[in-house]
């Protein structure tokens, strides 16, 4: 470091930052600074940066300069507040809270009331004039500190608290008086000493330092890592730590705490949404332990604070130009803002809010497009419950996260995971969820809680994950020990089927039938976005999709093998077929003909088998070209190894053995068994398949090309506009392609001469082997188009057999952070993506008009679509149901890049 360079700054006062410093200050710290800048009532405090956390996580030690920086900021805070941290007569108390760049609700740690001790609790009694409040605050500190910082089992504190209420004959915490709470503090301290092997620290600075380290450590807890993996948040960002002077919502009926949203995060509708809890501290609301009142009720409880809060909500939404999620506390009639962030929302709310903000003039259409994503659109396409179905209503709660979920009732996360892994669909049912339930929530189809509101842990996390959730179903009594729920006389045991409607909050016994969502009906053309019965969600989706289609460069095709799928794809907005797998045309009743081809001993037998297949293939192609008239249809010639068309070797062996034992041997079965043995390969994925089949079995590819050409000619003569493209699979060298192309050109010429048509059929190849990608410049000499088969390219680049590795070690790789996400789900940009990028450049250098597409499963993956836009592909191809997602993401990619892609 040079003499003129400032040493790295690890601590920022709330007056120093702004909302654009999320990388450094985390979301919470950046937004506290922003609210401070706006002149809103924020308790004074400071933020320790994510850089300090990274140093700690990398080295195991805090940065050397951190303690002095924290001391300087603490001194400034004490001067401003005119009191010292934990002083015995008039203590300053602080909270220590996590705050990563991306919101991770409930995943990391918070400790409130730091600075309380046996001495300073007496000072807090004098300061507040409320003995019960002071001892309750001390009790909460020991409980939170013990669990979070010292690793004491939280259930031990809860059990002691329940026992105290039972002894007193009360059911809620607030009915315990100061004497009860003093006893509880003694008990809690004993629990800490016994379980943590040390006394609860009485030095306030030691409390603060240990809490800061605990927040740093909470970045790498199992639940935080699991959440990051689920939400695709990088693991190296670290968390900031916010040290904030305490304000108290538990000082009596004129105090309280709440969470507010500037719009309904479940539906997107404008209005006053949120939860409020009188005489409580902040964590009580989010934990869902006590049922809250609606935020609108605050108007009758404390109109002055309510009016001030509504004005602040309007200020924040206008400033952030988005739905804001706000945490606040009222201390004896004075409102304090503890946090704001752009709020998590459901998929439907995201689309509605984006278009509402355009109509209000706060954002433009390009920004609205960035406010939604393909994963949200996919959620909107899931089915909903049939309103006409006969149902048995169990109960009703708060509609926290929409969707229609059906599954077997389970009452803990372990069972949810276990049953889900064995293929069962489950509904996780709890009194309330906590961060330790995250893996169970991920495994479940839906979540049901008997406590908590729209801002509880279950609701916030479920909305973020797109999971169906109903909260606060108070009439449902959940018994986790006996693993059952009870509503009146109805008992639901673990394993019984229940249906949860996150859009209405209703819970049903048994399985309720589902119907297509309105969004799917819109894409299918059965609902017009401007029709009277079209809801505002469909109208919002239509507006955003129309803009995405206007700005995108990437075209979107479908993977479809028959006319029915092709027609559906076209309704969904497909601009052609990027992959028609001809092997799917050889299944069912036609399998016998393929068997004859495989068993052929002479040229004559083989030609006869091919002649039988030709008209069937041709008829399939005619239907396909008619369905996609005027749009390109890329037909892949036969790709899989031949043994896939033959009976299973074990079943066939048993059949032959049984027949021989009965002296009733079947000649055809014997020949089939010999063929199965002959064609058996140790690694069929890398064996006789793709172009190799066409080179080894004379006439196979010629028959397929003839069927394509004759079908195209017939459509042309019927005044159609067929645009067939012939794709050769698994090419590794240009010589393979040249030999097949020569044969194909000859067949096409024969068909053109016989039918008097000019077909203009393009011939290209799949790029699915590393050698093909590395020699793309040579292959482009014989190919008019490339289509990247990223499924096989991923397998061959990584040396993976997908079916084997996903069943064996993928989970371990994800847990160890070797993968952030499966490379079969999202394109591996560094490896596979690098080959795609170089093949694009080399191919276009040889043939500037080379058409480039991708037809692997990555074609419908949102993140991968952005990569394919960036490298300059012409189109992506995906399953029909994913087409709207690909269209949306292609638009988002174009709007983000502003012409930066390689086209």
Identify the role of each PLM range:
Residues 465-467, 481:
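Residues forming the flavin
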Residues 46, 450-452, 471-474, 580, ...:
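Short beta->alpha connector loops at strand-helix junctions that form conserved
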Residues 2-389, 418, 424-427, 434-439, ...:
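Nucleotide/phosphate-binding sheet-loop regions of phosphoryl- and nucleotidyl-transfer enzymes
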Residues 68-72, 228-233, 369-419, 424-426, ...:
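Long, charged amphipathic helices and adjacent flexible linkers at domain junctions
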Residues 97-98, 519-521, 526-903:
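Conserved alpha/beta-domain cores
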Residues 445-451, 469, 555, 853:
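A short, small-residue-rich loop immediately preceding and capping a beta-strand
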Residues 242, 410, 427-429, 448, ...:
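Structural motif
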Residues 18-21, 401-443, 552-554, 831-849:
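C-terminal accessory/binding modules appended to enzymatic or scaffolding proteins
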């Amino acid at each position: 470091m040079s003499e003129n360079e400032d040493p790295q700054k690890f601590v920022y006062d709330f007056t120093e930052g702004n909302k654009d410093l999320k990388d450094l200050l985390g979301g919470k710290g950046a937004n506290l600074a922003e609210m401070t800048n706006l002149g809103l009532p924020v308790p004074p405090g400071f933020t320790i940066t994510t850089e300090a956390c990274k140093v700690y996580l990398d080295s195991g030690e805090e940065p050397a300069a951190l303690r002095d920086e924290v001391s300087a900021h603490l001194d400034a805070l004490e001067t401003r507040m005119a009191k010292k941290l934990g002083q015995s007569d008039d203590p300053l108390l602080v909270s220590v809270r996590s705050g990563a760049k991306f919101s991770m609700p409930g995943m990391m740690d918070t400790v409130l009331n730091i600075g309380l001790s046996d001495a300073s609790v007496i000072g807090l009694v004098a300061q507040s004039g409320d003995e019960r409040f002071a001892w309750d605050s001390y009790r909460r500190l020991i409980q939170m500190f013990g669990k979070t910082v010292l690793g004491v089992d939280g259930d031990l504190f809860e059990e002691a608290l329940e026992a105290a209420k039972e002894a007193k004959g009360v059911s809620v915490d607030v009915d315990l008086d100061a004497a009860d709470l003093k006893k509880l503090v003694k008990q809690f301290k004993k629990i800490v000493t016994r379980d943590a092997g040390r006394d609860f620290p009485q030095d306030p600075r030691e409390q603060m330092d240990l809490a800061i380290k605990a927040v740093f450590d909470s970045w790498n807890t199992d639940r935080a890592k699991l959440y990051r993996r689920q939400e695709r948040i990088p693991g190296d960002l670290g968390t900031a730590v916010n040290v904030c002077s305490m304000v108290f919502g538990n000082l009596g009926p004129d105090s309280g705490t709440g969470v507010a949203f500037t719009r309904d995060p479940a539906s997107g509708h404008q209005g006053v949404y949120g939860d409020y809890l009188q005489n409580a501290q902040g964590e009580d609301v989010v934990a869902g332990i006590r049922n809250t009142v609606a935020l609108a009720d605050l108007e009758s409880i404390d109109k002055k604070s309510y009016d001030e809060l509504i004005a602040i909500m309007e200020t924040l939404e206008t400033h952030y130009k988005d739905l804001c999620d706000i945490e606040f506390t009222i201390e004896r009639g004075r409102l304090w803002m503890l946090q704001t962030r752009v709020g998590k929302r459901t998929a439907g709310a995201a689309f509605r809010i984006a278009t509402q903000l355009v109509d209000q003039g706060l954002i433009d259409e390009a920004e609205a497009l960035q406010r939604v994503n393909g994963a949200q659109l996919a959620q909107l396409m899931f089915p909903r419950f049939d309103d006409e179905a006969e149902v048995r209503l169990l109960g009703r709660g708060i509609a926290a996260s929409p969707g229609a979920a059906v599954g077997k009732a389970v009452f803990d996360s372990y069972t949810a995971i276990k049953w889900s892994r064995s293929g069962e669909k489950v509904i996780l049912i709890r009194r309330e969820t906590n961060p330790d339930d995250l893996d169970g929530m991920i495994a479940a189809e839906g979540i049901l809680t008997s406590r908590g509101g729209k801002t509880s842990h279950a609701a916030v996390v479920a909305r973020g994950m797109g999971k169906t959730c109903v909260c606060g179903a108070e009439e449902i009594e959940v018994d986790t020990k006996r693993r059952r729920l009870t509503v009146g006389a109805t008992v639901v045991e673990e394993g019984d089927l229940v249906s949860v409607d996150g859009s209405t909050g209703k819970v049903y016994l048994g399985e309720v039938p589902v119907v297509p969502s309105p969004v799917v009906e819109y894409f299918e053309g059965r609902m017009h976005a401007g029709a009277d019965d079209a809801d505002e969600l469909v109208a919002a989706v239509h507006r955003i999709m129309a803009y995405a289609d206007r700005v995108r460069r990437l075209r979107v095709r479908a993977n479809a093998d028959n006319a029915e799928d092709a027609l559906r794809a076209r309704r969904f907005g497909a601009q052609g077929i990027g992959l028609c797998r001809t092997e799917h045309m050889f299944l069912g009743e036609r399998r016998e003909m393929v068997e004859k081809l495989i068993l052929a001993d002479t040229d004559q037998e083989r030609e006869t088998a091919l002649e039988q297949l030709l008209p069937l293939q041709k008829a399939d192609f005619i239907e396909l070209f008619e369905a996609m008239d005027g749009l390109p249809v890329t037909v892949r010639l036969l790709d899989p190894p031949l043994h896939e068309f033959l009976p299973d070797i074990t079943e066939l062996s048993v059949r032959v053995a049984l027949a021989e034992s009965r002296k009733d041997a079947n000649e055809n079965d014997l020949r089939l068994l010999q063929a199965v043995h002959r064609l058996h390969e140790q690694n069929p994925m890398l064996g006789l398949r793709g172009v190799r089949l066409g080179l080894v079995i004379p006439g196979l590819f010629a028959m397929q090309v003839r069927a394509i050409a004759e079908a195209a000619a017939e459509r042309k003569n019927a005044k159609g506009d067929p645009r067939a493209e012939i794709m050769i699979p698994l090419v590794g060298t240009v010589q393979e392609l040249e030999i097949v192309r020569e044969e194909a050109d000859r067949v096409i010429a024969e068909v053109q001469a016989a039918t008097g048509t000019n077909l203009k059929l393009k011939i290209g190849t799949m790029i699915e082997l590393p050698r093909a990608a590395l020699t793309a410049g040579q292959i482009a000499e014989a190919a008019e188009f490339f289509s990247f088969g990223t499924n096989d390219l991923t397998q061959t680049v990584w040396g993976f057999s997908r079916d084997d590795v996903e069943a064996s070690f993928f989970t371990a790789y994800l847990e160890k952070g070797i993968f952030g996400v499966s490379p079969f789900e999202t394109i591996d940009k560094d490896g596979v993506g690098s080959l795609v990028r170089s093949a694009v450049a080399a191919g276009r250098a040889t043939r500037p008009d080379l058409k480039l597409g991708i037809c692997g499963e990555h074609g419908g993956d949102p993140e991968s679509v952005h990569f394919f836009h960036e490298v300059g592909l012409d189109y992506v191809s995906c399953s029909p149901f994913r087409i709207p997602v690909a269209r949306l993401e292609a638009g988002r990619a174009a709007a983000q890049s502003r012409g930066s892609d390689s086209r």
